[in-house]
Amino acid sequence: MKQKILIRIAMTDDTTRAKAMKTAVQFKGVNAVEIKGDHRNQIEVTGVEVDMIALINTLRKKVAFAELVSVAKVEPPKDGDKKPEEEKKPEEKKPEEKKPEEKKPEPCCQPWQKPEPCYQPWPHDGYGVPSSYPYPCDPYNQIGEPVYNQDPNCRIM
């Protein structure tokens, strides 16, 4: 159920208004926030199933004193409320312009996956467990030692 909630907040400057709007927008279920009122001291919150009590308590903690002014249910427009001008106009068929299909670019790299460590098999001769069992043979799939450039182009003098 979509609803409009009007809340009066003790806002005196623009920074307080911005903080109140930011706090209200971050709340769960809120779709839109507007500043209303003659003194710009009210905000109108539009959303779906917004917990207004928790919203007011959060505004009181983070911004300033807040009180609930009104709550109104927003009904979607009905099909019978269409403008008569739209019904009188004959439907004109426009030639459809074909848009070229947009292809998504393929990623240049594969997503990172955690490598599976390999372990030595369990000794089956029954003489105990090695002290380092199980140990990964190559946990990061690195082959050999890293190679450092011995002759860099940039020299520090």
Curated annotation (Swiss-Prot):
Q: Where is the composition biased (Basic and acidic residues)?
A: 75-106
Propeptide feature: residues = 155-157
Q: Which residues carry this modification: Cysteine methyl ester?
A: C154
Gene3D superfamilies assigned to the protein according to its UniProt record, in alphabetical order = 3.30.70.100
Any one GO MF term held by the record is: metal ion binding
Q: Where is this region: Disordered?
A: 73-115
Is Metal-binding a UniProt keyword of this protein?
yes
The record, for InterPro entries, names: HIPP47/16 (IPR042885), HMA_dom (IPR006121)
Keywords, in A-Z order: Lipoprotein, Metal-binding, Methylation, Prenylation
- Residues with lipid group (S-farnesyl cysteine): C154
Residues covered by the HMA domain: 2-71
The answer to keyword Ribonucleoprotein applying to this record is no
Tell me the disulfide pairings in this chain.
Answer: none
- Function (record text): Probable heavy-metal-binding protein.
PANTHER family membership: HEAVY METAL-ASSOCIATED ISOPRENYLATED PLANT PROTEIN 47 (PTHR46932:SF12)
Q: Which family does it belong to?
A: Belongs to the HIPP family.
What is the name listed in the Swiss-Prot or TrEMBL entry for this protein?
Heavy metal-associated isoprenylated plant protein 16
Protein source organism: Arabidopsis thaliana (Mouse-ear cress)
